[in-house]
């Protein structure tokens, strides 16, 4: 009886190994499938992360490109108007698109979409970045038509006026505030028929006229120079055009813009919006010509005659004028020890000429606080 019972048990255990083997195979297959799926997901996630990074890099390239190639034409865009730029490829599979919006107070919002493209040109990843910008307008301490760290000597038939004056025939100028005629760290001396007027006419022995009043804006603007000219004599500055249709020829180093406006004769309209920043690391002598913008002279400036300039003149050395027909409308700042304005020149303070010279010549820079944003669509 016992032998029969054991035989029956052995017969009941037949096939158990096969069942266990099948169960083990199913478990192993499930584990392999799980590992495979997890690996596939991790690989897909890695690819997505790489593509997202590449799209972000394309967007960053768009941000940097706008700053590196800033055009002063952007400075005059309409307020709160979106200006879209053509898409640009970055390498074989990256692309960015830029939209620039001008806001009030000389500020801008730059939005950039970066795309990573697939082999067929389809978009496989997109990232949006933004940056707040502002025009890099330096802090100019202009409180007079002529500002000198040393004394000012005026002679001949010179007229220096701090009463706000628009350049001849310019339109669209907002009303300004009258300034002093001359402001200096020493005395202002007028001889002969010279006239220094303003509100007040003179500010003398001003102890606040330290070096930084002149060097700080000079160095800021120097870094944005449109024309860098060696020291020397320059004659016959006049606006010129090139190409067809004609456009202002900024490559001509004697083209300093067009300060004239209709109905004056010989107006070169293509250059009326060209306000270059002209920088010389040496001393300059200018004679017979016209221009507008910002003139920076690290050495001495000698104005010989028949020279007309609308905008800002900053001289780190001495300033001398002679002859007739010289006229500066805007502001003159000089840090040298000798300021002698004689002959028959005119120096008129003009808030309009100053504002346009800055607006049409400076470039943009990121806001120091909260300049960068990432947009989420």
Segments the model singles out, each with a brief description of its role:
Residues 1-14:
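N-terminal leader/signal peptides at the extreme start of proteins
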Residues 12, 72, 350-351:
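Polar helix-capping/helix-linker motif
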Residues 16-58:
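Aliphatic-rich helix starts adjacent to a transmembrane/signal segment
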Residues 20, 39-40, 44, 64-67, ...:
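Charged, amphipathic alpha-helical interaction segments
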Residues 101-240, 245, 270-377:
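Short, ordered "entry" segments at domain starts
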Residues 246-276:
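Eukaryote-specific, low-hydrophobicity, charge-rich regions
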């Amino acid at each position: 009886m016992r032998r029969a019972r054991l035989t029956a048990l052995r017969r009941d255990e037949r096939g158990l190994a096969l069942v266990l083997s099948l169960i083990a195979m199913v478990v192993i297959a499930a584990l392999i499938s799980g590992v495979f799926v997890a690996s596939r997901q991790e690989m897909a996630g890695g690819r997505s992360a790489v593509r997202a990074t590449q799209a972000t890099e394309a967007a960053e390239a768009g941000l940097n490109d706008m700053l590196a190639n800033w055009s002063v034409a952007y400075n005059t865009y309409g307020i709160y108007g979106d200006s879209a730029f053509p898409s640009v490829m970055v390498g074989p599979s990256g692309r960015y698109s830029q939209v620039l919006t001008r806001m009030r107070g000389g500020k801008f919002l730059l939005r950039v979409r970066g795309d990573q493209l697939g082999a067929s040109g389809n978009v496989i990843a997109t990232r949006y970045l933004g940056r707040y910008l502002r025009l890099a307008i330096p802090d100019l301490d202009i409180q007079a038509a002529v500002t000198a760290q040393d004394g000012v000597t005026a002679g001949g038939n010179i007229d220096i006026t701090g009463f706000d004056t628009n350049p001849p025939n310019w339109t669209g100028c907002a009303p300004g505030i009258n300034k002093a005629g001359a402001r200096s760290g020493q005395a202002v001396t007028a001889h002969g028929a010279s006239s220094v007027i303003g509100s007040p006419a003179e500010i003398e022995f001003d102890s606040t006229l330290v070096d930084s009043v002149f060097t700080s804006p000079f160095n800021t603007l120097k870094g944005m120079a449109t024309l860098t000219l060696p020291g020397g004599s320059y004659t016959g500055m006049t606006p010129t055009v090139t190409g067809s249709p004609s456009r202002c020829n900024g490559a001509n180093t004697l083209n300093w813009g067009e300060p004239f406006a209709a109905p004056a004769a010989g107006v070169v309209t293509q250059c009326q919006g060209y306000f270059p920043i002209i920088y010389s690391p040496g001393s300059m002598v200018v004679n017979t010509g016209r221009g507008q913008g910002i003139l920076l002279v690290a050495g001495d400036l000698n104005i010989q005659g028949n020279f007309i300039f609308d905008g800002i003149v900053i001289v780190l050395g001495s300033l001398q004028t002679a002859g007739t027909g010289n006229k500066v409308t805007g502001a003159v700042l000089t840090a040298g020890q000798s300021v002698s304005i004689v002959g028959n020149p005119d120096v008129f303070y003009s808030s309009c000429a100053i504002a346009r010279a800055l607006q049409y010549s400076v470039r943009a820079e990121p806001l120091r606080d909260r300049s960068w944003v990432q947009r989420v669509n």
